[in-house]
């Protein structure tokens, strides 16, 4: 049965995708200096389980996310794949980030997964997860030509690139595979567990709260 098609409205923050990418790069520069975003253990212990569904994504959404990012960055011998850099785990951390990201930012990631599924049913009359690999790749090629798909895909590729270039302590760039591929030597001092992103944000929020008392 063909699913009901919803209106695909791009959030205003993402209408100018180039500005969003510039703002995101500015945040990354600060994050690289400030410290790490998360603990490696979260990603290594949960990434497989998350693909079975979790508190934010259904099993279908998790599968769509994993499939799409691996189509964007495939294991084709031309550089690290999305799986190599644990892009799925990095995106899942972003979806759980309530300190820096707006609810609307994370909602846009998820709604894009739903739109991809709707587009699959519009073109192939079947859910995304039931498509063959060739059909999935063709579908991604088709929706990236659409306004919503071009915008959403640009955002997702930017996030995957973050997983490629950040310090491994952030959860992506597993075993420094991204740095090795880019022949990049990281700056020092490297981020540590004591000054990772959440801890810095928590301290800032506490100082702000104490100042309001």
Task: Kindly give the residue locations of the regions a language model identified.
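Mature-region segments of soluble proteins
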Residues: 2-3, 78-80, 86-213
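C-terminal segment of N-terminal export signals and the immediately downstream linker at the start
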Residues: 16-26, 41-79
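Short, amphipathic alpha-helical segments
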Residues: 22-32, 100, 110-112
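N-terminal secretory signal peptides
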Residues: 1-22
């Amino acid at each position: 049965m063909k699913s009901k098609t919803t209106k695909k409205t791009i959030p205003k923050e993402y209408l100018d995708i180039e500005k969003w990418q510039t703002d995101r790069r500015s945040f990354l520069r600060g994050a690289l200096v400030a410290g790490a975003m998360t603990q490696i253990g979260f990603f290594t212990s949960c990434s497989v389980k998350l693909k079975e569904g979790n508190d934010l994504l259904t099993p279908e959404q998790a599968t769509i996310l994993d499939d799409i990012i691996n189509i964007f960055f495939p294991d084709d011998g031309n550089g690290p794949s999305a799986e190599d850099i644990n892009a799925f785990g990095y995106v899942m951390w972003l979806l759980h980030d309530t300190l820096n990201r707006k609810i609307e930012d994370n909602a846009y990631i998820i709604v894009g997964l739903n739109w991809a599924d709707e587009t699959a049913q519009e073109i192939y009359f079947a859910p995304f997860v039931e498509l063959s690999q060739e059909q999935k790749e063709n579908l991604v090629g088709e929706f990236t030509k659409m306004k919503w798909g071009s915008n959403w895909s640009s955002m997702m590729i930017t996030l995957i690139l973050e997983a490629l270039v950040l310090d491994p302590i952030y959860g992506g760039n597993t075993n420094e595979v991204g740095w090795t591929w880019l022949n990049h030597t990281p700056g020092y001092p490297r981020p540590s567990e004591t000054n990772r992103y959440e801890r810095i944000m928590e301290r800032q929020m506490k100082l702000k709260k104490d100042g309001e008392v």
